[in-house]
Amino acid sequence: MIEEIKSQIHSHQKVMESIGQELSPKIAAVVELLADALGNGKKLLVMGNGGSAADAQHLVAELVGRFKMERRGLPAIALTTDTSILTAIGNDYGFENIFSRQIEALARPGDVVVGISTSGTSKNVYKALLVADELGCRTIGLLGRDGGTIAEIVDVPITVPCDDTPRVQEGHITIIHILCDLLEKRLFGERR
């Protein structure tokens, strides 16, 4: 058991190293994209399924509340939280439309839409990102494996290069924390 624990920690460290080496430029680009949009009165809409839904909510909580810095709240919405909306759309239009229908209702040109998918192939996330693009939104994919079909349609794909879902999720939450930290500094300076 001890060796398995060490092996999993080693796998985690390898993923973190690859994020630092391979994804830093894309993470920096997303910070700039978000700073530009949020600094100009646009909002962020975030979605995902399962653990990725939890990550979407985590990202939004850090932006609407605060990450490390006392500051005004930032306009961000998790499309994963309203069970009445999710079940109404799922029942009437199908599960593949639970996010795209919300994007139709809430997104405006210049808003930023983030789809989180460890596989890069979640059909409901894919469809919502297509709708977001049609509406003139900027799109970001927080993905895993090879990025899947979602990587092909977003403005900025950030793909954690790993096939192991738990390691991808650990990478996603690390990237989310980095984004929140750098975004606060970019928008509000170095104050605490």
Curated annotation (Swiss-Prot):
Under the GO molecular function aspect, what terms does this record hold? carbohydrate derivative binding; D-sedoheptulose 7-phosphate isomerase activity; zinc ion binding
Top-level lineage group: Bacteria
Instruction: State what protein this is by name.
Output: Phosphoheptose isomerase
**Subunit (UniProt):** Homotetramer.
**Co-factor binding details:** Binds 1 zinc ion per subunit.
Q: Which GO terms describe its biological process?
A: carbohydrate metabolic process; D-glycero-D-manno-heptose 7-phosphate biosynthetic process
Family from the record: Belongs to the SIS family. GmhA subfamily.
Briefly state the protein's biological role: Catalyzes the isomerization of sedoheptulose 7-phosphate in D-glycero-D-manno-heptose 7-phosphate.
Q: Which residues form the signal peptide?
A: none
Residues annotated to bind substrate = N49, G50, G51, E62, N91, D92, S117, T118, S119, S122, Q169
Coiled-coil ranges per the record? none
Kindly report the protein's main subcellular placement as a broad class. cytoplasm
Catalytic activity field:
2 D-sedoheptulose 7-phosphate = D-glycero-alpha-D-manno-heptose 7-phosphate + D-glycero-beta-D-manno-heptose 7-phosphate
- Which amino acids does the record list as binding Zn(2+)? H58, E62, Q169, H177
Q: Where is the SIS domain?
A: 34-192
> Cellular component terms, GO, for this chain's entry?
cytoplasm
Q: Where in the cell is it found?
A: Cytoplasm
| Cofactor entry | Zn(2+)
Give the pathway listed in the UniProt entry for this protein: Carbohydrate biosynthesis; D-glycero-D-manno-heptose 7-phosphate biosynthesis; D-glycero-alpha-D-manno-heptose 7-phosphate and D-glycero-beta-D-manno-heptose 7-phosphate from sedoheptulose 7-phosphate: step 1/1
Enzyme Commission designation: 5.3.1.28
- The entry's keywords: Carbohydrate metabolism, Cytoplasm, Isomerase, Metal-binding, Zinc
Other remarks on record?
The reaction produces a racemic mixture of D-glycero-alpha-D-manno-heptose 7-phosphate and D-glycero-beta-D-manno-heptose 7-phosphate.
